[in-house]
């Protein structure tokens, strides 16, 4: 599948997402395409959950006088003791640098610290967890405060 994005002008980029649903090792892989160029973004495999990883949201964050940021949000459902039960969310952030009819990306996910991934549900000993960055609006609020 593909998602059109407006980074510098209308629909100038797209995220291409392909998934392999093999029983042995399902995965999802994402690329950013623009200016006749494709760049690998990320790849997620099953990682022990009950269902394969899903790319649930893609967006661009713009801040005046700053490079745009591509946001990707993945989720995976986990279930049943002795595992945690709920949804694991994974956030990726990429700064997009424009240069001479080309572009490059810089992975800035580490700026989230431990907040780049988390459980929204219950762990194996019954403690409840709420992951705060499980939607684009929450991620953009975080970027409003922290993207310098």
Regions found by a protein language model. Give the residues of each.
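Terminal domain-start segments
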Residues: 1-49, 116-148
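Beta-propeller blade termini
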Residues: 1, 6, 52-63
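Acidic/hydrophobic-patterned starts of short beta strands in beta-sheet-rich repeat architectures
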Residues: 1, 11-16, 61-74
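Structural motif
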Residues: 2-5, 23-31, 76-95
């Amino acid at each position: 599948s593909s998602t059109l994005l407006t980074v510098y002008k209308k629909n100038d980029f797209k995220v291409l997402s392909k998934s392999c649903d093999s029983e042995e090792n399902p995965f999802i892989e994402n690329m950013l395409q623009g200016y006749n160029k494709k760049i690998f973004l990320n790849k997620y495999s099953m990682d022990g959950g009950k269902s394969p990883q899903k790319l649930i949201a893609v967006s661009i964050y713009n801040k005046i006088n700053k490079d745009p940021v591509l946001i990707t949000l993945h989720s995976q459902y986990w279930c049943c003791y002795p595992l945690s039960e709920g949804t694991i969310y994974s956030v990726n952030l990429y700064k997009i640098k424009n240069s001479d009819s080309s572009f490059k990306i810089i992975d800035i996910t580490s700026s989230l610290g431990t907040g780049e991934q988390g459980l929204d549900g219950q762990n194996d000993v019954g403690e409840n967890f709420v992951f705060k960055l499980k939607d684009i609006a929450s991620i953009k609020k975080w970027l409003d405060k922290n993207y310098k």
